[in-house]
Amino acid sequence: MKPPRRLRSAVAFAAAAACCIAGLAGAGPLARGAVANPALGLPELQVPAPALVALGRKLFFDRRLSANGTLSCAMCHVPAQGFTANELRTSVGMNGVSLRRNAPTLLNVAHVRRLFVDGRAATLEAQALQPLLHPEEMANPSLAAVLARIDSLADYRTPLRSAFNRPRASAAGLAAALAAYERSLIAAGSNFDRWYFGRQADALDETEKRGFALFVQHGCVQCHRIDGDHALFTDAAFHNIGVQANTDAQRLQSVAVLLAPGETTVVARAELRRIGVEDRADLGRYEVTRRAADRRAFRTPSLRNVALTGPYMHDGSFSTLAAVVDYYAGGGTPSDPAQDAGIRPLALDAADRAALVAFLGSLTSPVAASPNQP
């Protein structure tokens, strides 16, 4: 049986993007700068060249890169909202179409090994080009069309020359610049970092410390890992925690339709079928690997700055951290036979749950938001 047409299209544009950035390593002016002293709580990281970051930042905020000039990267990854979109469960794409997935934060994305929640991109360079070509996101017909548009804009000539010593754009340069800007979005040095790695005893209050103890006691650190000298709060693996099965069950009955930011209405599934709206399940990692074991499995997100990056889960189905804690405490979705065995009911009273939420709040970096405009 052939994959659905939409899945075949997604695989095709992902492959095209990957081909365009092949061979970036060691590409002269694309090379990154020196290794920086790591931010407290994070591993070492090569610092991108400043001119490359500046060009990437300009591209990131530029709506002219979309097919109809209405969308930019920053419209789904809003700096003042933790580089996600707090008002939307899932992103809104070209012509107002509601996408399947919540926009993940870009904070500390330099340390993410496999990009997108299904892990379909191995590098930031490969990831950066995909939204430009996705038919429901920025909807450009080809990278050539994007490059021609950039070359027609006089305000790009100086930034391009500063980054690459030439005034014209290339596919590799476009990918490298966007990736460089994303690599610059580092946010660590949280209260937890100061307490755990910096040994500042008073950096956390007693409730936050109790929340951390519960976090360890109940095995949350198995997936949201803490290493000896740093903590990415992810195992970079893919798990089915039951969320998609729960969402699918709700989809059989009704759908929340976005009317405006923060305003939704519930519409019966039968009514949507009448007007031809496509019914789209999300199979997660399976859409990349086609392995049955990967159905409804999604990449473990980092918990850094999680208090800033709601709504939560790959589909934005939980609006608060308290709701997320309640979901885990209840054992996820027990009716899903493929749910990860590590998801089980937890004995947590109201004070325990509040302490866990307080601990998660202690993971917020003081530099988690950056200026909105280039």
Can you name each region flagged by the protein language model?
Residues M1-V53, L59, V112, Q130, ...:
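Post-cleavage N-terminal segment of exported redox proteins
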Residues G28-Q130, D193-F318, A323-D326, T333-D336, ...:
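Short glycine/threonine-rich turn/loop motifs
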